[in-house]
Design a protein with these regions (language model features):
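Short, acidic loop-to-helix structural element flanking the phosphoryl-transfer center
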Residues: 80-108, 114-118, 146
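A metal-dependent, Asp-based hydrolase signature
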Residues: 46-80, 98
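Substrate-recognition "cap/lid" segment bordering the active-site pocket of phosphatases
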Residues: 84-87, 113-166, 170-179, 193-195
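Short acidic-hydrophobic, aromatic-tinged amphipathic segments that line or gate anion-handling sites
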Residues: 203-207
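Active-site neighborhood of HAD-like aspartate-dependent phosphohydrolases
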Residues: 1-43
């Protein structure tokens, strides 16, 4: 029976894509690089901010030194504008309230930098909305490597048999499965049903209340 739910952040709880795209395109404009439409950024994100920076940087600006400088530039711009257009997806606040009322333990596990995760979760959901919020940290492999999930579950006192991973991309489904967890894919995020199905999602949710329905079914 599921007792703990680990949520991805971007594309699952929050629609962050416009602020990410705006910050990235601002950096591109400063350097005279090509910019990209928001739809393209939906495929650039998901593997952490360093990988996002690499993807929007032209090939002639990808030395380690250049990428480090661009990462710092992007991070500063995004930090200043990360709440301009970002918002929880419709139904997410109600879902989290229902999960809390029914006694589920919830946590966030993201490839977004840990410092950004804490700030943005507290801004949109309050300081005590999740048992733990964990982002990308130095020395810990990013998703889909399961190391971070193992660490998070240990800190939560959770085990694979009673934990569900929820996310919007193949990276999230693979993360859950690599850690021995069932993985549920959400259809309102940055990717889509075809990618989630191909990755082997154990269930799909078209709207947040479908997650609650899935969990209630798992109880019986």
């Amino acid at each position: 029976m599921i007792k703990t739910i680990l949520f991805d952040l971007d594309g699952t709880l929050l629609n962050t894509i416009d602020d990410l795209a705006d910050a990235a395109n601002w950096v591109c404009t400063q350097h005279g690089w090509p910019t990209f439409p928001v739809e393209t950024y939906k495929h650039f994100v998901g593997n952490g901010i360093p990988k996002l920076v690499e993807r929007f940087s032209p090939e002639n600006a990808r030395t380690p030194e250049q990428l480090a400088a661009t990462l710092a530039e992007f991070s500063a711009r995004y930090d200043a504008h990360k709440e301009d257009k970002t918002a929880p997806y419709p139904g997410i606040l109600e879902l989290l309230a229902a999960l809390k009322a029914e006694g589920f333990q919830t946590a966030v596990f993201s490839n977004k930098a840990d410092a950004f995760c804490g700030k943005i979760i507290e801004h949109y959901f309050g300081p005590d909305s999740f048992s733990l919020v964990r982002g990308s940290r130095p020395g810990v492999p990013t998703k889909p490597d399961p190391a971070g999930v193992y660490s998070l579950m240990a800190d939560l006192g959770a085990d694979p048999q009673s934990t569900l991973f929820v996310g919007d991309s193949d990276v999230d489904i693979l993360t859950g499965h690599n850690a021995g967890l069932p993985a549920l894919g959400v259809l309102w995020g940055f990717r889509g049903e075809a990618e989630l199905t191909a990755a082997g999602a154990d269930a799909l949710a078209a709207k947040p209340e479908d997650i609650l329905a899935y969990l209630r079914c798992e109880k019986h």
